[in-house]
């Protein structure tokens, strides 16, 4: 594990559901993508969760050639200060013929697989939703002042 460059410590996963597959690479950069390619694993997948929010340090041409996704999902905040996704990555995806879904443009992206095909639904969340506190249930605990440990009644 690298101490510098924690993006290259991202966990990469390939999820297979019947004829559909998904590759998730977290914030992996080109260097980690090369390591993934060196494993020799078959990476071809239906959907690629585009690495590092669409940063130009990820989703390299060699990686795209191996994954060959039909769809790419970019999780990125609207108006982020990093400028993600970059035009360079969007061009790579376009060159590879990938249909792109972006959270900054389309909001929530829900991809469903039945094992034969994938479907996408998007929902732009236009108004913030007020959070809801869980129901408060009153509980009783007993403090042992010698050990300073809490116990539930009936606990031995």
Enumerate the language-model features and the residues they cover.
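General beta-strand recognition
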Residues: 22-23, 110, 119, 149-151
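Mature, structured domains enriched in cysteine- and short glycine motifs
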Residues: 95, 123-124, 128-156
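Extracytoplasmic
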Residues: 8-10, 31, 106, 145, ...
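Binuclear metal-ion centers of metallo-dependent hydrolases, dominated by the metallo-beta-lactamase
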Residues: 3-7, 78-132
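Structural signal for conserved beta-strand scaffold positions within catalytic alpha/beta enzyme cores
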Residues: 49-50, 74, 102, 122, ...
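Short, surface-exposed charged micro-motifs
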Residues: 12-14, 110, 140
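Short strand-coil-strand connectors
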Residues: 16-18, 114, 121, 146
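Active-site-proximal loop/helix segments of hydrolase catalytic cores
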Residues: 1-85
